[in-house]
Amino acid sequence: MSTDNKQSLPAITLAAIGVVYGDIGTSPLYTLRECLSGQFGFGLERDAVFGFLSLIFWLLIFVVSIKYLTFVMRADNAGEGGILTLMSLAGRNTSARTTSMLVIMGLIGGSFFYGEVVITPAISVMSAIEGLEIVAPQLDTWIVPLSIIVLTLLFMIQKHGTAMVGKLFAPIMLTWFLILAGLGLRSIIANPEVLHALNPMWAVHFFLEYKTVSFIALGAVVLSITGGEALYADMGHFGKFPIRLAWFTVVLPSLTLNYFGQGALLLKNPEAIKNPFFLLAPDWALIPLLIIAALATVIASQAVISGVFSLTRQAVRLGYLSPMRIIHTSEMESGQIYIPFVNWMLYVAVVIVIVSFEHSSNLAAAYGIAVTGTMVLTSILSTTVARQNWHWNKYFVALILIAFLCVDIPLFTANLDKLLSGGWLPLSLGTVMFIVMTTWKSERFRLLRRMHEHGNSLEAMIASLEKSPPVRVPGTAVYMSRAINVIPFALMHNLKHNKVLHERVILLTLRTEDAPYVHNVRRVQIEQLSPTFWRVVASYGWRETPNVEEVFHRCGLEGLSCRMMETSFFMSHESLILGKRPWYLRLRGKLYLLLQRNALRAPDQFEIPPNRVIELGTQVEI
């Protein structure tokens, strides 16, 4: 490691603490309270407290430290992570049928994320504001309004970007974790016997003593590891080593000390169960703690919102969601984006959730099903990558998968008990997103196949036009083409109706590669098909936004001079009608028509001046 890298490592690690660990770092606000609040029939006896603490600690070790940080983070696509990246990697060296199954798993995982992301800001901010019940009990009726006000401000500032505010995230979250550690250590010193719960035998004893009820209680224990997926999803922003370093040096010790500190407090004062986190603090520190808890939960919510924007952009670029307006809020960092439609839809959903559930304890009952479902899918996809891409021994990979599923499946099954008490919410939202993504992908494929059924050869058509040219007019025409060797619809209709052709014709295809970024050297490929026809293929990664002006600049460097304001862009605009279908496919077709009508039009997607665009309409039956 170079000197420069050594100097920058602390800064990157600090930044990772500020962004990556917001969700899991605010879990102590509510996790142990939900475990021991009486909903499972446990009292605050020593065996129950020690059992829950042991389960929480060893889940943090096994799921976060071993599974995600050690194993899953090995699977990266040019340094990027996330469930859709894992899906893409897993399907690279498999059969078509297996790839289809893996794609479905990846889309379900992505859909689950959309389901949980509605709950995360609500439960995080509400659990912090609920500290008012301790500071000033008479203000408890203000918890819901204040939570909505805080989140309204957060969603309103999204369009301005978080570059300036983001600089404060890291020091605030570092302070938060140090406070977690300090509060916990203070309580542990007063009752050090709680450290016996570090022994995993207490977790085993917990299951043996409480049997079926202990299994159901896993639905509350899982709250301690929500946010684990963010470590993998944010890998591209900070790198593997800083994320791992932050976990083992700051986050894990702080979480452990705080959970065990809460346990020590409950053994000494069972009445503290109403809010063991805030009651760890002395009276004089309650208001400052409430303020920094609110800030920490806002930061956790911001990380989740940014994650939704990133996942949506990736899904759009990979063709699983319809094109939508994406605004870059930073000239320096391509990952800082704002998607207005997603932002306000998420805001409305979060407000409805807060008003409907009214208390973080009620939200906790809805939290966990989608998280644990994603954990199961991550285990299957990551071990598939280990076998197919890394060529690990199949028996060793099977052993790893069994070990992961022995933890993931019980956690997921235990959370199914929450289905009627609120777990239906993330599952319903996830199901809607899965239907939307699969509908757009499959119907889009059906449309393109229908449009390319004419079967005419591009080479033959160009040869015919060069041999018997129509009237040629001065200038350059660019025809946007979705496929490389297919005649663009706009070209056929221009010749059919206008019977003219420009002196120079460029067939432009914008392609999304299976990588986050494409190097500028490989950005543009130019091929001259005839004296007056050129084919240009511009490649972009799924973290990049295509820009025709940049493509023209690259073409100029390669010897094909193009000027935006002297070029006419011909595009086809499809007017879709539904053909005869079974009722269920007709419903899917109607959903696709709705998505198509509201999709961002091509000129806006590719930043083409509207006065240079000519759209030729055509009716297509699907």
Swiss-Prot record:
It is found in: Cell inner membrane. This is Low affinity potassium transport system protein Kup. Coiled coil: none annotated. GO terms for cellular component: plasma membrane. The keyword Thylakoid does not apply. Responsible for the low-affinity transport of potassium into the cell. Likely operates as a K(+):H(+) symporter. Belongs to the HAK/KUP transporter (TC 2.A.72) family. The keyword Cell membrane applies. Its main location: membrane. The chain crosses the membrane at residues 9-29, 49-69, 103-123, 137-157, 165-185, 213-233, 247-267, 276-296, 337-357, 363-383, 396-416, 419-439. InterPro entries: K+_transporter (IPR003855), K_trans_C (IPR053952), K_trans_N (IPR053951), Kup (IPR023051).
